[in-house]
Amino acid sequence: MLKATIDAEIFREAIEAISALVPECRLHTAEDGITTRAVDTANVAMIAFTLKKEAFDTFKATKSEIGVDISKMKNIFNMGGKGDLISLELADNAQKMAVSVHGYHYSITLLDTNTIRKDPNSPTINLPGKVVISGEDLNNAIKAAAVISDKIAMGINPKDQTFYMVAEGDTDHIQREFGKDELKSLSPVEARSLFSLDYLRDMGKVMSKATEVEVCLGIDHPVRFSFDIAGGNGHVEYLLAPRIEAD
């Protein structure tokens, strides 16, 4: 059972965070909020998402698992404007969820959870390099790199105490270094890995709105991005596998 109302902007932000990686997912409702954990079809990127009940104007739910077409929900919530409230209502064992926004009333058929990939386990990975940077700065560097390449190297230089992002195209090169004065914090541990910009572009759009993004790195290891949404009443973690660098 779920019965809730929430600001349209807050819920749109939440749905966009999920839709950056997957078109559908299993949403878990509970008395304290909504969560999901999902991996993309290529097993390259994963999201762990939490939206606390405090993010909602009203919230009442029991423990359940529902299959949601995130792409469809994203299009529906685009109907909402600033200051609009979204109403969500789902009865026990129901196959449709009632959604109301900006005077529009939808009856959305839920997906069969048996057709959706099971929630992935949270991997235990040691990522000693840690940087906290503004989401806007991070996204700007990603966008700049995407102009000339489809991949980007991220790393930490402990000697210079900098966080750097480097991209190489066929004939072009771009590098951006962030010193300690441009970062919220930095753990000066050597780290460097290469990542696909196809994934980072979509992640970057979501992270651009975050005041702070924690970036955790290793050497030829995945990268973990952690940041808050919904005024601190929600949290998102992205985990992205590295690309193998050619010799």
Swiss-Prot record:
* One GO-annotated biological process of the protein: leading strand elongation
Which top-rank group of organisms is this from? Archaea
Q: Name one Pfam family in it.
A: PCNA_N
Q: Which InterPro entries match?
A: DNA_clamp_sf, Pr_cel_nuc_antig, Pr_cel_nuc_antig_N
Arranged from A to Z, the UniProt key words for this protein are: DNA replication, DNA-binding
The cross-references to CDD domains, in alphabetical order and at most eight, read: PCNA (cd00577)
Keyword Chloroplast among UniProt keywords: no
Q: Name one GO molecular function term.
A: DNA polymerase processivity factor activity
Could you tell me which NCBIfam families the record lists for this protein? PRK01115.1-5
General function of this protein: Sliding clamp subunit that acts as a moving platform for DNA processing. Responsible for tethering the catalytic subunit of DNA polymerase and other proteins to DNA during high-speed replication.
Instruction: Give the family per the record.
Output: Belongs to the PCNA family.
- Note the subunit structure: Homotrimer. The subunits circularize to form a toroid; DNA passes through its center. Replication factor C (RFC) is required to load the toroid on the DNA.
Protein name per its UniProtKB record = DNA polymerase sliding clamp
Source species of the chain: Methanoregula boonei (strain DSM 21154 / JCM 14090 / 6A8)
Gene, per the UniProt record: pcn
